[in-house]
A protein has these predicted regions:
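Binding-site signature for planar aromatic cofactors or substrates
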Residues: 1-197
Protein backbone atom coordinates (compact mmCIF):
# COMPACT_ATOMS: atom_id res chain seq x y z
CA UNK A 1 0.00 0.00 0.00
CA UNK A 2 1.42 3.35 -1.05
CA UNK A 3 0.85 6.93 0.07
CA UNK A 4 -0.12 6.18 3.67
CA UNK A 5 -1.25 9.50 5.13
CA UNK A 6 -0.98 10.60 8.74
CA UNK A 7 -4.73 11.27 8.63
CA UNK A 8 -7.08 8.43 7.62
CA UNK A 9 -9.61 10.86 6.15
CA UNK A 10 -7.04 11.85 3.53
CA UNK A 11 -6.57 8.21 2.58
CA UNK A 12 -10.34 7.66 2.56
CA UNK A 13 -10.77 10.63 0.24
CA UNK A 14 -8.11 9.24 -2.11
CA UNK A 15 -9.62 5.74 -2.18
CA UNK A 16 -13.16 7.07 -2.59
CA UNK A 17 -12.06 9.19 -5.54
CA UNK A 18 -10.28 6.22 -7.10
CA UNK A 19 -13.27 3.88 -6.82
CA UNK A 20 -15.49 6.54 -8.38
CA UNK A 21 -13.01 7.05 -11.22
CA UNK A 22 -11.84 3.50 -11.85
CA UNK A 23 -14.26 1.23 -10.04
CA UNK A 24 -16.53 0.66 -13.01
CA UNK A 25 -20.25 0.17 -12.49
CA UNK A 26 -20.22 0.22 -8.71
CA UNK A 27 -22.19 2.28 -6.20
CA UNK A 28 -19.15 3.70 -4.48
CA UNK A 29 -21.09 5.31 -1.62
CA UNK A 30 -22.91 2.12 -0.59
CA UNK A 31 -21.85 1.05 2.89
CA UNK A 32 -23.09 -1.20 5.64
CA UNK A 33 -23.82 0.11 9.10
CA UNK A 34 -23.82 -2.30 12.01
CA UNK A 35 -25.64 -1.49 15.24
CA UNK A 36 -26.49 -3.33 18.44
CA UNK A 37 -30.26 -3.75 18.54
CA UNK A 38 -32.56 -3.39 21.51
CA UNK A 39 -32.58 -7.20 21.64
CA UNK A 40 -28.81 -7.20 22.22
CA UNK A 41 -27.97 -8.68 18.83
CA UNK A 42 -25.90 -6.97 16.13
CA UNK A 43 -27.54 -6.11 12.83
CA UNK A 44 -26.11 -4.63 9.68
CA UNK A 45 -27.81 -3.13 6.66
CA UNK A 46 -26.84 -1.14 3.59
CA UNK A 47 -27.19 2.64 3.57
CA UNK A 48 -25.75 5.36 1.35
CA UNK A 49 -22.96 7.68 2.42
CA UNK A 50 -24.14 11.17 1.50
CA UNK A 51 -21.18 13.22 2.65
CA UNK A 52 -17.87 12.88 4.43
CA UNK A 53 -15.86 15.57 6.17
CA UNK A 54 -12.72 15.63 8.30
CA UNK A 55 -15.08 15.07 11.23
CA UNK A 56 -16.85 11.95 9.97
CA UNK A 57 -19.33 10.19 7.70
CA UNK A 58 -22.91 11.37 7.14
CA UNK A 59 -26.00 9.37 6.20
CA UNK A 60 -29.74 9.98 6.52
CA UNK A 61 -32.58 7.86 7.86
CA UNK A 62 -35.79 7.74 9.85
CA UNK A 63 -34.88 8.38 13.49
CA UNK A 64 -37.76 6.11 14.58
CA UNK A 65 -36.54 3.19 12.47
CA UNK A 66 -34.93 0.10 13.94
CA UNK A 67 -31.48 1.53 13.28
CA UNK A 68 -32.47 4.90 14.72
CA UNK A 69 -33.69 3.28 17.93
CA UNK A 70 -30.55 1.15 18.11
CA UNK A 71 -28.33 4.22 17.74
CA UNK A 72 -30.32 6.08 20.41
CA UNK A 73 -29.73 3.13 22.75
CA UNK A 74 -26.07 2.59 21.84
CA UNK A 75 -24.35 5.05 19.48
CA UNK A 76 -21.32 2.81 18.92
CA UNK A 77 -21.54 1.66 15.30
CA UNK A 78 -19.41 0.13 12.57
CA UNK A 79 -19.41 1.14 8.90
CA UNK A 80 -17.86 -0.87 6.10
CA UNK A 81 -17.21 -0.29 2.42
CA UNK A 82 -16.37 -3.22 0.15
CA UNK A 83 -15.26 -2.60 -3.42
CA UNK A 84 -14.67 -6.06 -4.91
CA UNK A 85 -13.55 -4.92 -8.33
CA UNK A 86 -10.53 -3.04 -6.99
CA UNK A 87 -9.95 -5.37 -4.01
CA UNK A 88 -10.42 -2.79 -1.30
CA UNK A 89 -12.30 -2.66 1.97
CA UNK A 90 -12.60 -0.01 4.68
CA UNK A 91 -13.93 -0.71 8.18
CA UNK A 92 -14.82 2.24 10.40
CA UNK A 93 -15.69 2.07 14.10
CA UNK A 94 -17.19 5.20 15.54
CA UNK A 95 -19.84 7.03 17.48
CA UNK A 96 -23.02 8.18 15.72
CA UNK A 97 -24.76 11.40 16.61
CA UNK A 98 -27.49 13.47 15.00
CA UNK A 99 -26.40 16.33 12.78
CA UNK A 100 -27.96 19.79 13.06
CA UNK A 101 -31.54 20.37 11.94
CA UNK A 102 -30.25 22.95 9.45
CA UNK A 103 -28.03 20.37 7.74
CA UNK A 104 -30.86 17.83 7.66
CA UNK A 105 -33.22 20.47 6.25
CA UNK A 106 -30.73 21.37 3.55
CA UNK A 107 -30.30 17.80 2.38
CA UNK A 108 -34.04 17.08 2.57
CA UNK A 109 -34.76 20.05 0.32
CA UNK A 110 -32.45 18.56 -2.33
CA UNK A 111 -34.40 15.28 -2.53
CA UNK A 112 -37.01 14.49 -5.20
CA UNK A 113 -40.61 15.11 -4.11
CA UNK A 114 -41.36 11.37 -4.19
CA UNK A 115 -38.58 10.67 -1.70
CA UNK A 116 -39.76 13.52 0.53
CA UNK A 117 -43.29 12.12 0.58
CA UNK A 118 -41.94 8.64 1.28
CA UNK A 119 -40.24 9.98 4.41
CA UNK A 120 -43.65 11.10 5.65
CA UNK A 121 -45.58 8.01 4.54
CA UNK A 122 -43.30 5.24 5.78
CA UNK A 123 -43.14 4.37 9.46
CA UNK A 124 -39.86 2.62 8.74
CA UNK A 125 -39.37 -0.83 10.32
CA UNK A 126 -42.94 -0.99 11.67
CA UNK A 127 -45.21 -3.91 10.76
CA UNK A 128 -47.87 -2.88 8.21
CA UNK A 129 -51.02 -4.79 7.19
CA UNK A 130 -50.58 -4.67 3.42
CA UNK A 131 -49.02 -3.02 0.39
CA UNK A 132 -52.28 -1.13 -0.09
CA UNK A 133 -51.84 0.43 3.35
CA UNK A 134 -48.50 1.90 2.25
CA UNK A 135 -49.90 3.12 -1.08
CA UNK A 136 -52.87 4.72 0.67
CA UNK A 137 -50.59 6.51 3.14
CA UNK A 138 -48.48 7.86 0.30
CA UNK A 139 -51.61 9.05 -1.51
CA UNK A 140 -52.84 10.82 1.63
CA UNK A 141 -49.58 12.75 1.98
CA UNK A 142 -49.58 13.57 -1.73
CA UNK A 143 -52.97 15.18 -1.15
CA UNK A 144 -51.86 16.89 2.07
CA UNK A 145 -48.86 18.53 0.41
CA UNK A 146 -50.47 19.24 -2.96
CA UNK A 147 -49.20 22.64 -4.17
CA UNK A 148 -47.32 23.07 -0.88
CA UNK A 149 -43.71 22.86 0.20
CA UNK A 150 -42.89 19.36 1.47
CA UNK A 151 -41.14 20.06 4.75
CA UNK A 152 -38.85 17.63 6.55
CA UNK A 153 -40.59 15.51 9.20
CA UNK A 154 -39.01 15.77 12.64
CA UNK A 155 -38.43 12.00 12.72
CA UNK A 156 -36.18 12.09 9.64
CA UNK A 157 -32.64 13.42 9.42
CA UNK A 158 -28.93 12.79 9.37
CA UNK A 159 -26.31 11.16 11.53
CA UNK A 160 -22.59 11.71 11.49
CA UNK A 161 -20.37 8.81 12.47
CA UNK A 162 -17.24 10.19 14.12
CA UNK A 163 -14.50 7.58 13.72
CA UNK A 164 -12.36 6.20 16.51
CA UNK A 165 -10.65 3.66 14.23
CA UNK A 166 -10.42 3.14 10.48
CA UNK A 167 -8.90 0.06 8.86
CA UNK A 168 -7.91 -0.01 5.19
CA UNK A 169 -7.58 -3.37 3.43
CA UNK A 170 -5.96 -3.78 0.02
CA UNK A 171 -5.93 -7.16 -1.72
CA UNK A 172 -2.52 -8.54 -2.68
CA UNK A 173 -1.30 -11.80 -4.33
CA UNK A 174 -0.97 -14.98 -2.27
CA UNK A 175 -3.40 -13.58 0.31
CA UNK A 176 -0.61 -11.38 1.66
CA UNK A 177 -2.95 -8.44 1.81
CA UNK A 178 -2.18 -4.97 3.16
CA UNK A 179 -4.05 -3.94 6.32
CA UNK A 180 -3.41 -0.51 7.79
CA UNK A 181 -5.27 0.51 10.94
CA UNK A 182 -5.64 4.04 12.28
CA UNK A 183 -6.71 4.48 15.92
CA UNK A 184 -7.63 7.86 17.37
CA UNK A 185 -5.58 8.84 20.42
CA UNK A 186 -6.54 11.05 23.37
CA UNK A 187 -4.59 13.96 21.87
CA UNK A 188 -6.54 13.49 18.58
CA UNK A 189 -3.51 12.23 16.70
CA UNK A 190 -3.87 8.94 14.85
CA UNK A 191 -1.84 5.87 15.75
CA UNK A 192 -0.96 3.93 12.59
CA UNK A 193 -0.34 0.17 12.67
CA UNK A 194 0.15 -2.51 10.05
CA UNK A 195 -1.81 -5.70 10.71
CA UNK A 196 -1.07 -9.21 9.48
CA UNK A 197 -3.47 -10.29 6.72
Amino acid sequence: MKDISNNPMELFQKWFYEVEEFGGDVESNAMTISTIGLDGFPKNRAVLLKKYTWEGFIFYTNYNSEKGKAIANSPHVCLSFLWHNIERQIIIKGVAEKISENLSDGYFESRPDGSKLGAWASDQSEVVPSRKYLDDRLASFEKQFENKEITRPEHWGGYIVKPISIEFWQGRPNRMHDRIKYTLQENYDWKIERLAP
